[in-house]
Amino acid sequence: MSTLEEVLREAYKLVTPSEEEERELKKVTEKVKALIADAINKYGIEAEIGVYGSSARSTWLPGQRDIDIFIVLTNRNINIKDVITLLSRYFSERGVTWSMRYAQHPYLSLLVDGYEVDVVPCYKISFGERPITAADRTPLHHKFLVEKLSEEQRRDVRLLKLFMKTIGVYGAEIKVEGFSGYLTELLVAYYGSFIDVLKAASRWRPYRTYITFSESRAKFKAPLVVVDPVDPERNVAAAVSLTSMSTFILASRRFLKNPSITYFQQRQGAVIKTNVVEVVFPYPNEPPDIVWGRYKRIGRSVFNWLKQCGFRVYRWGVESDEKSYVSLIYVVEQIELPPYMLHRGPPVYDGAVDAFVEKYLDKDIIGPFVQGSRVYVIKRRRYTNISDCLKTYLGKGDYTIRINLYEGALVRKNAWIT
């Protein structure tokens, strides 16, 4: 069994970028900054250029190939959409590959030398000033963290990110509903180190954990609350679902009890053969957050429908490559149900008992009969085959139902837990 010190020593190697990666990142960053500087000069845009995010604070993970560059507008009369239009024209003229992305407002994502560089316009604000767009806070976030995090703590941020990535809770997008990069940095800044974050998290309780860097009376309804030091009316942990928070609590407890390098390795556990049904849809041409949000809602409604039909669902989830398909996966007790089911009625002394009995008098059922104090019938199921049940609910459409072919994460042994 490895000691905590041995595991951390090995894990630190996994989260430290090579000198070559550092040089390449800096080279691409400077290249795009120069292009943006030329563009804002050409079009007379009053702005400052800032590199923010993990690449600017040395909290990025090896292999990460994305950079965030902000155009901080100093003139609020400038429309962000106009800036995007001018920049897209500029990059097109110079043969730079770009695509339009959307958050609260549009921004550009460039592909430069194998790196994805997000170019995000925002307005310049001061501490205590209300943001005009969500992106306006980013320069202030950067300033706060640069002042708070030591070099050792930045290394611990990288460790925490890989830990969270391994257990599946890293990322604030709807796909994950987990911890954002900014949130991981705040946790290390607040508690002091990677181990101290885990020790604290092992004592967290959902809906009773409130973290703030200064006195705050703001109220939030969320499993975890971390008040933004830049905007006291904002919960940085708003995206963290109950499941993600609870997964992190469990992983923290288990790692501290039995440290292992498995918490920092992207591995797959063995497939456990069980009954599983998968509904596969073609991937729509829409932003990922829209797609994940929609199919999570559809997935929940299908889960409820399967329960109504008598199929016991052990667990379910949504998976996608965000290119060609999106799937709803259900791990179930049975694919085929027996033709008859026991249906419980009201107690014999309840006023509703007469209506229940009369409903089934002329039906092809066993009963009505009394068991204990209740009336029951044994009646024929509407659906015995899970595919028929799904087709009725989903109707005609462009989807495929696959039975017992899925071998993804939902039917695998947990590879990291110790």
Curated annotation (Swiss-Prot):
Its EC number is 2.7.7.72. Its cofactor is Mg(2+). Catalyzes the addition and repair of the essential 3'-terminal CCA sequence in tRNAs without using a nucleic acid template. Adds these three nucleotides in the order of C, C, and A to the tRNA nucleotide-73, using CTP and ATP as substrates and producing inorganic pyrophosphate. tRNA 3'-terminal CCA addition is required both for tRNA processing and repair. Also involved in tRNA surveillance by mediating tandem CCA addition to generate a CCACCA at the 3' terminus of unstable tRNAs. While stable tRNAs receive only 3'-terminal CCA, unstable tRNAs are marked with CCACCA and rapidly degraded. It catalyses: a tRNA precursor + 2 CTP + ATP = a tRNA with a 3' CCA end + 3 diphosphate; a tRNA with a 3' CCA end + 2 CTP + ATP = a tRNA with a 3' CCACCA end + 3 diphosphate. CTP binds at S54, R57, H141, K161, Y170. This is CCA-adding enzyme. ATP binds at S54, R57, H141, K161, Y170. Disulfide bonds: none annotated. One of its GO terms (molecular function) is CCA tRNA nucleotidyltransferase activity. Homodimer. Keywords: ATP-binding, Magnesium, Metal-binding, Nucleotide-binding, Nucleotidyltransferase, RNA repair, RNA-binding, Transferase, tRNA processing. Coiled coil: none annotated. One of its GO terms (biological process) is RNA repair. It comes from the Archaea. A single active site specifically recognizes both ATP and CTP and is responsible for their addition. NCBIfam families: cca_archaeal. Signal peptide: none annotated. SUPFAM superfamilies: Nucleotidyltransferase (SSF81301), PAP/Archaeal CCA-adding enzyme, C-terminal domain (SSF55003), PAP/OAS1 substrate-binding domain (SSF81631). It is an enzyme of class 2 (transferase). Gene3D superfamilies: Beta Polymerase, domain 2 (3.30.460.10), CCA tRNA nucleotidyltransferase, domain 2 (1.10.1410.30), Poly(A) polymerase predicted RNA binding domain (3.30.70.590). Mg(2+) binds at D66, D68, D118. Belongs to the tRNA nucleotidyltransferase/poly(A) polymerase family. Archaeal CCA-adding enzyme subfamily.
